[in-house]
Structure formats: structure tokens, C-alpha cells
């Protein structure tokens, strides 16, 4: 069993045990009407749009620095991030919906609930906790699940980042007409990253979609390697959580887009 399969199995167990229903019953609803649109930001931004992530750990990283997360969010916004991603998985990534709820009020930027969504109830909880965007991972969903969850999220006025790992998954994302597509540079079986995976996946990309490169981006040289793939933005977590000089580092990542 891969790490991803293990995580999905755990999510199914949480759904069966009433975890998400309990969250829906106990979390106070957060008004997200003042949140900016990430897609609008991409459309207006001549430089790469940055989704800056809040994370505490991952299955491959257990030693991320402890930060004042409210300050981290403030710094992200001040130094040019266009959206914030917040992990809500507790067991594997050290996040929570309570953290999402607390931090979303600290920024007017769009906030992505980053989790392993397989059921509409999880979308309800994400929205109630203050997310204005959700992540759907093509690899863990059937075509019907992907279509139904995508349409449900859109009906709830949420933006959707549809994550793909190979060209076949990219075609599946096109089938639901996903406006926002994330290319994950992580090998899901071995959980190792290769940033240039983005170049391979986007060789024959279609126009009228926005593309975000995710995972494995540690410095400016990594961005240069994938800039000419025609990406519109980056999702970066570990490098930003480790950085002690966001005022210098984050603006450097916002390179001019190169449309291919």
C-alpha cells in the first residue's frame, strides 16, 4: 500500500466514524465573502502567482520549524503571495480545520483547504471553516467522483484546484473543464520530487486553463527550470516554512510568466 492509499483509507474511516459530521456540527461558520478570487489574481498578474502554504509536517518531513502562523500568513500577504494553502489533515500533516478557521480570518487572500477530499461532506466542512478554494486529487477519485465533487464545489462558490500527476490525469482534468490545474511533481508511489516533471506533463497542454506547479520547488533555480513550460503559478510549502527571510525570498519567486 502506498502512502497515498493509506491516507485515503484513513479518510474513509473518518467519514464512517462521523469525524466530518462532528466538525460540521461544532465549527463556527466563517464568512468568506471578502475573500479575493485566485483565478482573478492569476488573470491580472503578469508574474507567477504564488500559493504559499502553511504546513507543520508531511510523511517525508518531520522537522519543519515552528512558526507564529498568524505572522507567517501576514508575511505571505505582505511579500506578494496571491493565495494561502492550509493543510487540514491532522494525522499525516499536523494540520486541522480549527487551524484553517483561525488563520483564514487573518488574511483577505484566497485560502485553499488542502486535504484528501473524497466526499461532499469534506467540502462542506472546508467551506464552513473558511476555505474559498479546495483541492481535488485526480489520482484518488473515479471520473464520476471527480465530476460530482468538482460541480458540487463550484455550486458552493468555491474555486477548485484539480491536481494531476501524469498526462492521463491531465486529460481527466480537462474532461471536467477544470479552470485551475495543479501539476504535482511528487512521485505518489515513492513520495520523491522532480520539479521538471512539470515540463513533461505540460508539453501538450491546452489553452484556456491555468497551471500551477506543486511540490519540490526550493529556490529560484527550480523556478527557472520550469518557467518555460507556461505555468501561471507555484504552490510552495516547505521552502517558505524554512525561510527566515521571506521579504527577500518570496518576491524572487514571482518571475515574469513565459507563455508557451
Swiss-Prot record:
Quote any Pfam family the record assigns. Answer: IGPS
Q: Which reaction does it catalyse?
A: 1-(2-carboxyphenylamino)-1-deoxy-D-ribulose 5-phosphate + H(+) = (1S,2R)-1-C-(indol-3-yl)glycerol 3-phosphate + CO2 + H2O
Instruction: Cite the GO molecular-function annotations of the record.
Output: indole-3-glycerol-phosphate synthase activity; phosphoribosylanthranilate isomerase activity
State the EC number(s). 4.1.1.48
Choose any GO biological process term that the UniProt entry carries and state it: L-tryptophan biosynthetic process
Which pathway, metabolic or otherwise, does it act in? Amino-acid biosynthesis; L-tryptophan biosynthesis; L-tryptophan from chorismate: step 4/5
Q: Which SUPFAM superfamilies match?
A: Ribulose-phoshate binding barrel (SSF51366)
Tell me the keywords, alphabetical order. Answer: Amino-acid biosynthesis, Aromatic amino acid biosynthesis, Decarboxylase, Lyase, Tryptophan biosynthesis
What Gene3D superfamilies does the record tag this protein with?
Aldolase class I
The family line of this record is: Belongs to the TrpC family.
| PANTHER family assigned | INDOLE-3-GLYCEROL-PHOSPHATE SYNTHASE, TRYPTOPHAN BIOSYNTHESIS PROTEIN
Protein name, entry field: Indole-3-glycerol phosphate synthase
Which species? Staphylococcus aureus (strain MRSA252)
Amino acid at each position: 500500500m502506498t502512502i497515498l492509499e493509506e491516507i485515503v483509507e484513513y479518510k474513509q474511516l473518518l467519514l464512517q466514524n462521523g469525524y466530518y459530521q462532528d466538525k460540521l456540527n461544532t465549527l463556527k461558520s466563517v464568512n468568506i465573502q471578502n475573500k479575493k478570487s485566485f483565478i482573478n489574481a492569476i488573470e491580472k498578474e503578469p508574474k507567477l502567482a504564488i500559493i504559499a502554504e502553511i504546513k507543520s509536517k508531511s510523511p517525508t518531513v518531520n522537522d519543519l520549524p515552528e512558526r507564529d502562523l498568524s505572522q507567517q500568513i501576514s508575511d505571505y500577504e505582505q511579500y506578494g503571495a496571491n493565495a494561502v494553502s492550509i493543510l487540514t489533515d491532522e494525522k499525516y500533516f499536523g494540520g486541522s480545520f480549527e487551524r484553517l478557521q483561525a488563520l483564514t480570518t487573518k488574511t483577505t487572500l484566497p485560502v485553499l483547504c488542502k486535504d484528501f477530499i473524497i466526499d461532499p461532506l469534506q467540502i462542506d466542512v472546508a467551506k464552513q471553516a473558511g476555505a474559498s478554494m479546495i483541492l481535488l486529487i485526480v489520482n484518488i477519485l473515479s471520473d464520476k467522483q471527480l465530476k460530482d465533487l468538482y460541480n458540487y464545489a463550484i455550486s458552493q462558490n468555491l474555486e477548485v484546484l484539480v491536481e494531476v500527476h501524469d498526462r492521463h490525469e491531465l486529460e481527466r482534468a480537462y474532461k471536467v473543464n477544470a479552470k485551475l490545474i495543479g501539476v504535482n511533481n511528487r512521485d505518489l508511489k515513492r513520495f520523491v520530487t522532480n520539479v521538471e516533471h512539470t515540463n513533461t506533463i505540460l508539453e501538450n497542454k491546452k489553452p484556456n486553463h491555468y497551471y500551477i506547479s506543486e511540490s519540490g520547488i526550493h529556490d529560484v533555480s527550480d523556478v527557472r527550470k520550469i518557467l518555460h513550460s507556461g505555468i501561471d503559478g507555484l504552490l510552495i510549502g516547505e521552502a517558505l516554512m524554512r525561510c527566515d527571510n521571506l521579504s527577500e525570498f518570496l518576491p524572487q519567486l514571482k518571475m515574469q510568466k513565459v507563455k508557451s
